[in-house]
Design a protein with these regions (language model features):
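Short beta-alpha junctions and helix-cap segments that line functional grooves
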Residues: 9, 36, 52-54, 95-98
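Short Gly/Pro-enriched turn/cap motifs at secondary-structure boundaries
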Residues: 28-31, 55-58, 74-75, 98-105
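Glycine-rich beta->alpha junctions and the first turn(s) of the following alpha-helix
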Residues: 93-190
Length: 203
């Protein structure tokens, strides 16, 4: 963003006065960013925002959103995407929150004829893709790290359970059929961990 935007927002975010969320994933395209169908259409000195974003982390609690929207071109135009600062309480913003499998709460957010002033544009028009690309790489690796960590904990707990849970007087871990299943899950975990480390090294 501009120096004025940084001066206005960064101290408030760092100080905890403002909680933000990044809304860029869409239902039909997921991480295919160029396929963004949310639009910000010029209207007078500002814009009118329409569209939907899904799986917005912190979306339920956030009071401001950074939203990626198309300001020019079509789905084949990578240079027509821009970022906007949107008040989450503005007229036309509607949230639906839900819990993911790991318990984290996320939100789907729709924008219907949301009026934005000219200074809501974050940075330059058409400059969103480079910023979002970099953040997406980090986000995907972070999510993978979380998933691999959860997988490791669950495997360890399951292995411990097979050693202490008895059936017919012996630990269930002594049964070959269960041992085969545990080996499969451990192999999947080690493979996932190796892929995560490879992604971290290459990134």
């Amino acid at each position: 963003g501009s120096e004025a935007q940084q001066a206005e927002w960064l101290p408030r975010i760092i100080g905890g006065e403002v909680l933000g969320a990044f809304a860029y994933v869409e239902r039909q395209s997921r991480f295919a960013l160029h396929d963004c169908q949310t639009t910000a259409t010029k209207s007078g000195d500002g814009y009118v925002l329409n569209g939907e974003k899904v799986v917005v982390f912190n979306g339920e609690q956030a009071d401001h959103l950074v939203v990626m929207a198309r300001t020019a071109g079509d789905q084949s135009d990578n240079d027509g995407l821009s970022l906007f600062i949107v008040d989450a309480a503005a007229a036309g913003v509607d949230k639906m929150s839900y819990a993911m499998m790991d318990g984290q709460r996320v939100a789907n957010i729709t924008f219907k004829d949301v009026s934005l002033s000219a200074d809501a544009l974050l940075g330059e028009e058409g400059g969103a893709l480079a910023v979002v690309d970099a953040l997406t790489d980090e986000a995907i690796i972070a999510l993978a790290a979380e998933a691999v960590g959860i997988m490791g904990v669950l495997n360890a707990k399951t292995l411990e359970y097979t050693k202490t849970r008895e059936q017919f007087g012996v630990a269930i871990g002594s049964y070959q059929a269960l041992q085969h299943r545990m080996v499969d899950t451990m192999m999947a975990y080690e493979q996932s961990k190796s892929l995560l480390f490879k992604a971290l090294c290459e990134y």
